[in-house]
Regions:
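A glycine-rich (often HGG/GG-containing) alpha/beta subdomain
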Residues: 1-103
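Surface-exposed beta-strand edges and their flanking turn/coil or helix-capping segments
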Residues: 16-19, 67, 109, 127, ...
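Intrinsically disordered, low-complexity regions enriched in small/polar residues
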Residues: 21-23, 55, 121, 186, ...
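Generic detector of bulky aromatic hydrophobic side chains
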Residues: 66-68, 124, 184, 190
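Glycine/serine-rich phosphate-binding loop and adjoining beta1-alpha1 elements at the start
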Residues: 77-176
Length: 195
């Protein structure tokens, strides 16, 4: 398996947006067209990353060309910002991504569902053979186990929940009332929540 990754680790947000696939019917058609040309592959596209996992070897050139077409960027620029993983390193990268260990916020919750959705999208269209099925099912099982059996499962973690917590903390420091981070009532400056 090989993986080509364009993420927050290698490209700024404005660049990453050029590789993103929209939601809705338009996005579905774009993903299908992309994957049809990519071959046996899974496409993961989130706000922080676009990654293509392809079965076998020798796919980097083809995937870089497809990503170049998608983004409107030159092949050389795509090569400059893309991270490449092959074989066991590609598998290890997928496991880190699915578990939230390669996220902007380590342990964030959303990525597991996004990986599952990307995998099922390809599997339902017959684009996953034995290798991709085995690797993705293993990564999803591992991520689920980590989420249920480690401290990562003790709190809900995402960029949004952390931002809300920071707003709440800042309002408290300023002596202002703010909506509580759990969404119930207003929190006074002393931290007590009013119903």
């Amino acid at each position: 398996m090989e993986c080509i990754s364009i993420s927050f680790r290698s490209a700024p947000e404005e660049t990453r947006k050029r590789f993103a696939f929209p939601a809705g019917e338009t996005g579905i058609k774009e993903r299908e067209a992309f994957l049809e040309r990519a071959g046996e592959a899974v496409l993961l596209s989130t706000c922080n990353r676009t990654e293509v996992y392809a079965a076998g070897e020798g796919s980097f050139g083809r995937l870089e060309e497809l990503l170049s077409e998608k983004s409107g960027m030159a092949d050389t620029e795509v090569k400059r910002i893309a991270r490449r993983f092959a074989g066991e390193k590609a598998c290890a990268h997928l496991y880190r991504v699915a578990c939230g260990m390669d996220s902007m916020v380590v342990g964030e919750d959303e990525i597991l569902g996004q990986v599952r959705t990307a995998y099922l999208f390809s599997a339902e269209r017959g684009l996953c053979g034995y290798e991709l099925n085995a690797v993705f099912q293993g990564a999803l099982a591992c991520a689920k186990k980590i989420k249920t059996e480690t401290l990562l499962s003790k709190t809900s973690v995402s960029v949004a929940t952390l931002a809300c917590a920071e707003i709440f903390r800042f309002a408290k420091l300023c002596g202002k009332a703010a909506a509580s981070p759990d969404g119930f009532g207003a929190a006074e400056a002393d931290g007590e929540v009013e119903p």
